[in-house]
């Protein structure tokens, strides 16, 4: 991106490639709006600034930065350097590209380095929402600066209609032109390497054949080819692992020859020159003292079996020529060339070296020396049975005089067999024989040059008795690879185990709430959780009251306790710096959310309806309900208009039963309270499941003044076997609506879909949770919890079609995420989002920008009473935590064998995998059934907040509607929950995603194998593709092998080779049983991998029953590691939800591409401010209004008696 500009610097030139995005066409078209917005933003005050500065402060900070960096002159530029992340080029692959694009249209620019935001150049501040206000002169409807209550002018109806029609025509033309441009690009765009590979690997299946097999669409054929390409890669990885496991040693080491250890050669063999020969079936021709056909091993008077007969076939006249010469008067035959017939007397000796020199002559001179050509040829044709080897310990035997040369073992005592009357030998031979220091030593280095080398070679030819026990280079390499792999795998297994224990014992307690309404004894609480988790419909245990206001002693100090170097996140406490938790409410502690003194209601239980308002609302009047209107720290973008007037059902009206906000210092659980949204996404769930889910959320011990239930129904769906549709079921669980349910209208919004389905409509219902007449929760324990229901009803065009309004769970999440982004950035919003804004205001009395965290729960999940408190405590205690999850327990453990095999799998995935990842703050999968995300986080100076879940980069990528590749479909259609976790880590790799074991929920898992098969198909495929995304993120914790990126890579490879791994495991076990010797190392490794989780159970679970669940899991390993992955890989191109979610119309076939064209002119988008002005205009025309008080604001009435 372009570098931050100094005051007075000229605008970047068009030819500057680093400034291209600043001069985009979108920005040039809005140039005339920049100055206009700058004026208004400069005049509007801001209480708690999310990411906004005052002009004067920004200018001062910018000048300070220049001075600190030693740069002189307004026109100086920073030099580009690789050491500054904020100076890197920001293109669409940058993790904060969209955030930069959004924030450049605001008065400040963001920082990704931890510094406070830096101001951009003058004239850079503008807003996306200004496009809806492109009016000039006298006919302009609204003004963007000043008081919004000033008289308003309207355009004539004819002009407005004409302008609207013109806008629709322009939109249609632009869409058609864009579609044609995309089609042209598709035709000329070169295929990617991956597409080319898939086409090559599937050349044998042309398109016309695939069409015959039920793939008429190009997208289907493309997905099938990509599937085959992925399967081929999986097979290659599996083959590589198999080769490394079994084939590498055989390839580089080969089949080792048969080797016989010295002193263990049996009497069936004779040894010649260090090799053993099997002579048990041999016969000897007739010779002196040897009858014809006799066996030399047993038939002769002297038994030669097991002896060394090297002197029978001596190697002469080779390297020893001219070293060993004929003595004077010798009887050894020789020729004219000086060749000798033998060197030693031709006698055998014992293999253990115990024979004494024998210089006698039997029968005749040269008897048994085998000097004839026939004898030599017969010997050379013999095949040796194997080498005779010595270990290094054998060479150090004190009873023998052994040395080693070039791998050959030499018996120096055999030099005593020389007959001085027959031959002469070098004196070096005697020196070596008499030197005790050479015993058991390798003489190769000592005898390596010149004459000494000849001596060593000569000795190897005449006194070699065997070979040293050594491996080839290939065998050594294979052993190195084996042991390195063993150490590597063991290190991963052991480190994961140890770190999981460390997290359980020491780290996890830091994130938990100091106290909750549950029993403080951990054993008692664990037992309560286990009992509660055994039945899906069992309510949580009774809660105790811990609503004690936390106040610190505030003594005035004569000396200053802070300085300009003090952190805004710490407060002085007796000379020590104590960390101060930061929330939206705590930052406004000097001006409370609810004006007035602390009332006695805060001393009562916050979850008791009697302390705040009765179930019928009788204890609250209108004045009290408006107590939350005066939000001194609230952003002026919203607060000004809200305080102006209160038309029933619109933005200014607050429900009479709204729950008063406690003062910020009220900390019932030892940490500042943060406002939370509890998102429950529904599809086809039944009444009983939804009821228990909402009951569990409503009955959590977290104060109901700081939690709001938000239910989103994904279409007009009726579950299988249900009497009512899911929206009707949910609406029957809401009471005291702001607007009567039959009067609620549908509003448009931009859905996550393609074609005409991109336009969708939804209804917004706001009220309070209704426990029902037959509730199992006693009335005195029922809390009054704000509730909002969004029903995606669909457009009129799809009213008669199947599942109107259904766009998927991701679309439901995007409705909320996009809304929060637009609230935080003050962007244009749809009519649906405006109604959501008003609905939240009306039932809570606070602005939606006060919400900091979102709890995401599926409609079939039940939450333990203190789980929400523990999760929010972790968020408040550590601002770096951007996401977390709790433990999911199985409620139907004993329903069938299918549920039984899942119990331990759930346990180990949390307490080992997620616990290990939490140590580094990089949990790769936050399950969508029970997780929490941070909407925004404090950063930098006081009152500075940066978007996290509401970040444009997260929202933009998560709302991707063009899903045209196999990879994208597996990410966005099957595993959207896991992809959201991936997006968060990819966008904010330095922040944390953790596991909070104190937060617990329960759910029902599939009890039929086909349902489990369908569920795991989606999970495994999405896991593979999400790991492919995460393995490319290089900024995660750690470096090289000691990093989360490396752990993710290992996990990806491990997931891909699961079928091959279980096959190899069975092979090793069976091979160890059948063949000897037993392969010890693989068995030890297997025992450690499977046994350590059992130790983890004993240490962390404290219940023996989980050991039994582990044994059941081990018996089902073929299902987990072979059946499920193999089925999933073959179904890579199946994007339906299968048997997991069934409706009255049958199985869910997924969300296919929408037909037709998207007409954006049907969706009205304005800033909240503009919507509110429209409402006021309608109020003025209807003649309704409230008499303003002093200063133009309505008269404020203190609910606590103050004035």
Swiss-Prot record:
Q: Where are the transmembrane segments?
A: 228-248, 487-507, 1046-1066, 1080-1100, 1104-1124
Entry's localization field = Cell membrane
InterPro entries per UniProt? Chitin_synth, CHS4-like_dom, Nucleotide-diphossugar_trans
GO cellular component terms given for this protein: cell septum; cellular bud neck; chitosome; incipient cellular bud site; plasma membrane; prospore membrane
Gene3D superfamilies, per this entry? Answer: Spore Coat Polysaccharide Biosynthesis Protein SpsA, Chain A (3.90.550.10)
Topology of the protein relative to the lipid bilayer:
Multi-pass membrane protein
Give the span(s) annotated as Disordered.
Answer: 1-182, 604-632, 1182-1203
Basic residues: bias regions = 47-60, 157-172
Give, as one word, the top-level EC class: transferase
Q: Which residues are glycosylated?
A: 38, 128, 358, 397, 419, 588, 607, 800, 1021
What is catalysed by this protein?
[(1->4)-N-acetyl-beta-D-glucosaminyl](n) + UDP-N-acetyl-alpha-D-glucosamine = [(1->4)-N-acetyl-beta-D-glucosaminyl](n+1) + UDP + H(+)
**Which keywords describe this protein according to UniProt?**
Cell membrane, Glycoprotein, Glycosyltransferase, Membrane, Transferase, Transmembrane, Transmembrane helix
What function does the entry list? Answer: Polymerizes chitin, a structural polymer of the cell wall and septum, by transferring the sugar moiety of UDP-GlcNAc to the non-reducing end of the growing chitin polymer. Plays an important role in septal growth or maintenance. Mediates colony spore formation. ChsE and chsD seem to play a functionally redundant role in lateral cell wall chitin synthesis.
Family listed = Belongs to the chitin synthase family. Class IV subfamily.
Instruction: Quote the protein name from its UniProt record.
Output: Chitin synthase D
Q: What is the lineage of its organism?
A: Eukaryota, Fungi, Dikarya, Ascomycota, Pezizomycotina
């Amino acid at each position: 991106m372009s570098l931050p500009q100094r005051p007075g610097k000229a605008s970047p030139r068009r030819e500057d490639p680093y400034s291209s995005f600043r001069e985009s066409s979108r920005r040039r078209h809005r140039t005339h709006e920049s100055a206009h917005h700058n004026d208004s933003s400069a005049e509007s005050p801001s209480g708690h600034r999310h990411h906004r500065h005052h002009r004067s402060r920004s200018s001062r900070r910018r000048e300070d930065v220049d001075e600190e960096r030693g740069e002189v002159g307004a026109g100086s530029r920073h030099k580009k350097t690789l050491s500054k992340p904020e100076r890197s080029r920001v293109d669409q692959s940058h993790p904060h590209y969209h955030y930069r694009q959004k924030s450049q249209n605001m008065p400040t620019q963001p920082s990704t380095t931890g510094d406070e935001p830096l101001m951009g150049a003058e004239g850079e501040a503008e807003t996306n929402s200004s496009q809806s206000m492109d009016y000039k002169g006298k006919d302009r409807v609204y003004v963007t600066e000043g008081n919004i209550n000033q008289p308003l002018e309207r355009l004539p109806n004819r002009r407005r209609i004409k302008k609207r029609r013109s806008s629709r025509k322009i939109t249609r033309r632009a869409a058609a032109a864009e579609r044609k441009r995309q089609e042209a690009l598709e035709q000329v765009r070169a295929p990617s390497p991956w597409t080319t590979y898939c086409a090559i690997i599937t050349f044998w299946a042309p398109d016309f054949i695939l069409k015959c097999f039920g793939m008429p669409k190009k997208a289907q054929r493309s997905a099938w080819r990509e599937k085959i390409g992925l399967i081929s890669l999986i097979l290659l990885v599996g083959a590589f692992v198999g080769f490394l496991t079994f084939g590498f040693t055989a390839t580089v080491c080969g089949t080792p020859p048969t080797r016989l250890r010295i002193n263990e050669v049996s009497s069936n063999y004779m040894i010649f020159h260090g090799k053993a020969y099997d002579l048990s079936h041999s016969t000897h021709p007739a010779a002196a003292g040897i009858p014809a056909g006799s066996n030399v091993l047993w038939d002769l008077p002297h038994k030669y079996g097991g002896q060394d007969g090297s002197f029978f076939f001596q190697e002469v006249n080779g390297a020893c020529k001219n070293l060993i010469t004929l003595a004077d008067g010798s009887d050894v035959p020789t020729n004219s060339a000086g060749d000798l017939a033998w060197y030693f007397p031709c006698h055998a000796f014992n293999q253990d070296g115990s024979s004494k020199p024998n210089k006698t002559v039997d029968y005749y001179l040269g008897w048994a020396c085998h000097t004839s050509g026939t004898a030599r040829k017969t010997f050379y044709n013999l095949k040796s049975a194997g080498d005779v080897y010595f270990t290094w310990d054998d060479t150090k035997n004190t009873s023998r005089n052994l040395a080693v040369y070039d791998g050959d073992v030499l018996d120096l005592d055999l030099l005593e067999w020389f007959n001085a009357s027959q031959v002469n030998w070098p004196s070096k031979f005697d020196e070596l024989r008499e030197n005790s220091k050479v015993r058991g030593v390798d003489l190769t280095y000592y005898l390596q040059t010149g004459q000494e080398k000849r001596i060593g070679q000569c000795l190897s030819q005449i006194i070699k008795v065997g070979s040293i026990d050594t491996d080839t280079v290939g065998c050594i390499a294979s052993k190195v690879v084996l042991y390195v792999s063993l150490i590597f795998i063991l290190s991963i297994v052991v480190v994961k185990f140890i770190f999981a224990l460390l997290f359980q014992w020491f780290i996890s307690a830091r994130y938990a709430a100091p106290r909750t309404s549950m029993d403080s004894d951990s054993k008692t609480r664990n037992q309560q959780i286990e009992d509660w988790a055994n039945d899906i419909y069992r309510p949580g245990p009774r809660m105790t009251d811990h609503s004690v206001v936390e106040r610190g002693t505030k003594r005035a100090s004569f000396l200053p306790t802070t300085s300009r170097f003090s952190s805004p996140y710490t407060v002085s406490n007796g000379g020590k710096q104590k960390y101060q938790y930061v929330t939206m409410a705590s930052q406004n502690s000097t001006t409370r959310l609810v004006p007035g003194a602390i009332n006695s209601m805060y001393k009562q239980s916050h979850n008791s309806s009697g302390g705040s308002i009765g179930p019928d609302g009788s204890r609250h009047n209108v004045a009290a309900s408006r107590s939350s209107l005066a939000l001194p720290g609230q952003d002026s973008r919203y607060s000004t208009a809200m305080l102006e007037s209160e038309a029933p059902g619109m933005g200014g009206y607050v429900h009479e039963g709204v729950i008063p906000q406690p003062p910020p210092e009220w900390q019932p659980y030892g940490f500042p309270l943060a406002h939370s949204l509890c998102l429950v996404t529904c599809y086809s769930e039944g009444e009983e499941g939804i009821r228990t889910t909402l009951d569990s959320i409503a009955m959590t011990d977290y104060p109901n003044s700081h939690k709001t239930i938000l239910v989103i129904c994904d279409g007009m769906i009726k579950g299988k076997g249900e009497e009512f549709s899911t929206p009707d079921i949910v609406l029957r669980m809401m009471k005291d609506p702001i607007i009567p349910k039959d009067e609620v209208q549908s509003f448009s919004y931009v859905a996550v879909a393609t074609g005409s389905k991109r336009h969708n409509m939804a209804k917004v219902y706001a009220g309070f949770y209704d426990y029902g007449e037959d509730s199992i929760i006693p009335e005195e324990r029922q809390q009054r919890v704000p509730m909002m229901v969004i029903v995606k009803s669909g457009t009129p065009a799809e009213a008669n079609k199947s599942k109107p309004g259904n766009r998927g769970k991701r679309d439901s999440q995007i409705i909320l995420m996009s809304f929060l982004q637009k609230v935080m950035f003050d962007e244009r919003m749809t009519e649906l989002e405006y109604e959501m804004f008003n609905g939240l205001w009306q039932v809570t009395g606070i602005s939606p920008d006060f919400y900091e965290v979102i709890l995401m729960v599926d409609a079939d999940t039940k939450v333990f009473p203190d789980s929400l408190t523990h999760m929010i405590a972790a968020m408040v205690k550590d601002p770096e935590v951007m996401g977390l999850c709790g433990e999911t327990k199985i409620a139907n453990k004993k329903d069938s064998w299918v549920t039984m095999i899942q119990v331990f799998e759930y346990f180990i995935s949390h307490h080992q995998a997620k616990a290990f990842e939490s140590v580094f703050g990089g949990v790769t999968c936050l399950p969508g059934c029970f997780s929490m995300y941070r909407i925004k986080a404090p950063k930098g100076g006081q009152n500075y907040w940066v978007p996290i879940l509401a970040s444009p980069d997260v929202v933009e990528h998560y709302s991707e509607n063009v899903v045209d590749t196999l990879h994208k479909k597996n990410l966005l259609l099957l595993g959207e929950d896991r992809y959201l976790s991936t997006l968060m880590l990819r966008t904010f790799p330095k922040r944390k995603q953790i596991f909070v074991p104190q937060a617990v929920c329960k759910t029902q898992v599939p009890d039929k194998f086909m349902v489990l098969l369908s569920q795991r198909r989606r999970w495994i495929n999405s896991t593979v593709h999400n790991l492919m995304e995460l393995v490319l993120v290089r900024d995660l914790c750690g470096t090289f092998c000691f990093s989360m990126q490396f752990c993710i890579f290992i996990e990806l490879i491990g997931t891909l080779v699961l079928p091959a791994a279980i096959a190899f495991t069975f092979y090793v076990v069976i091979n160890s049983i059948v063949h000897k010797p037993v392969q010890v190392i693989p068995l030890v490794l297997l025992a450690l991998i499977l046994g350590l989780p059992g130790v983890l159970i004993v240490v962390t679970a404290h219940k023996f029953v989980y050991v039994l669940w582990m044994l059941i899991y081990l018996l089902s390993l073929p299902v987990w590691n072979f059946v499920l992955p193999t089925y999933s890989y073959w179904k890579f191109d199946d994007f339906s939800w299968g048997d997991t979610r069934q409706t009255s119309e049958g199985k869910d076939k997924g969300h296919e591409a929408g037909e037709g064209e998207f007409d954006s002119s049907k969706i009205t988008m304005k800033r909240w401010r503009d919507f509110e002005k429209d409402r006021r205009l309608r109020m003025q025309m209807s003649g309704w209004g409230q008499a303003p008080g002093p200063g133009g604001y309505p008269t404020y009435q203190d609910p606590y008696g103050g004035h």
